[in-house]
């Protein structure tokens, strides 16, 4: 694991399974062409102070991006969902699809489900990674992946979930350019997932990842 990267066992860190940090709830809004959402977040959850810059950039870009059509009844996923800003946006944008919001962090999962209920979204399923039915094939994945878990763990995570995309599926990721966005793009392309940068803004890259199976 890279130097100065917190250990996944750190009880205060967002990728801990059961963070022990005292609860400090905060509310924030997510606005876009698909409407306005009101969410809560908490200590021990990714972006505990509100909507983080990377996710904000990602949602702005994706609101205008011409994505391939998604068939009603499809499964979509947000890996590392945190409090649910991306997953809830997907649920609003694709009301006829089922959105899997996936996170190792139980506090994040609880808050994400609470946020979905609060916003009247019934097409979100919140799960820990190991709880997701391995037979499910996803039409698309949107994610602000947990870069700080370390390069090797991140590669393992992405390799696992990219393999679960449909044969014509697409993943969209946002990655800080100073935390390896370009090298990650090259790695995914070398892994036979052709990756294109569709936007670069405020220090973040938004990547489109295709399947070639």
Show the residue positions of the predicted features.
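N-terminal auxiliary segments of SAM/dcSAM-dependent transferases
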Residues: 1-33, 44
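Class I S-adenosyl-L-methionine
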Residues: 10-24, 180-213
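Class I SAM-dependent methyltransferase Rossmann-like catalytic core
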Residues: 42-50
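Conserved SAM/SAH cofactor-binding pocket of Class I
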Residues: 53-134, 140-143
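Short beta->alpha hinge that forms the Motif I/post-I loop of the SAM-binding pocket
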Residues: 103-107, 153, 176
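A short SAM/SAH-binding and catalytic strip from SAM-dependent methyltransferases
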Residues: 139-152
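A short glycine-rich, Lys/Arg-flanked "PGG" loop and its adjoining helix->strand segment in the class I
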Residues: 155-167
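Conserved beta-strand signature within the Rossmann-like core of class I S-adenosyl-L-methionine
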Residues: 168-175
């Amino acid at each position: 694991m890279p130097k100065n990267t917190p250990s996944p066992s750190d009880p205060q860190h967002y990728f801990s399974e059961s963070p022990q940090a005292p609860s400090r709830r905060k509310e924030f809004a997510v606005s876009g062409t698909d409407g306005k959402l009101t969410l809560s977040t908490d200590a021990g959850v990714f972006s505990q102070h509100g909507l983080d810059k990377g996710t904000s950039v990602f949602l702005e870009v994706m609101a205008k991006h011409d994505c391939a059509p998604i068939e009603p009844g499809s499964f979509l996923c947000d890996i590392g969902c945190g409090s649910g800003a991306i997953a809830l946006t997907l649920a609003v944008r694709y009301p006829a699809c089922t959105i899997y919001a996936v996170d190792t962090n139980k506090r994040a999962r609880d808050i994400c489900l609470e946020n979905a209920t609060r916003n009247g979204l019934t097409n979100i399923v919140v799960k820990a990674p190991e709880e997701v039915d391995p037979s499910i094939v996803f039409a698309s994945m949107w994610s602000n992946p947990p870069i700080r878990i370390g390069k090797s763990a991140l590669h393992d995570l992405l390799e696992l979930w990219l393999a679960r995309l449909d044969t014509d599926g697409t993943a969209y990721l946002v990655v800080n350019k100073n935390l390896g966005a370009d090298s990650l793009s090259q790695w995914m392309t070398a892994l036979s997932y052709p990756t294109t940068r569709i936007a670069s803004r405020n220090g973040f890259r938004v990547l489109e990842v295709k399947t070639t199976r």
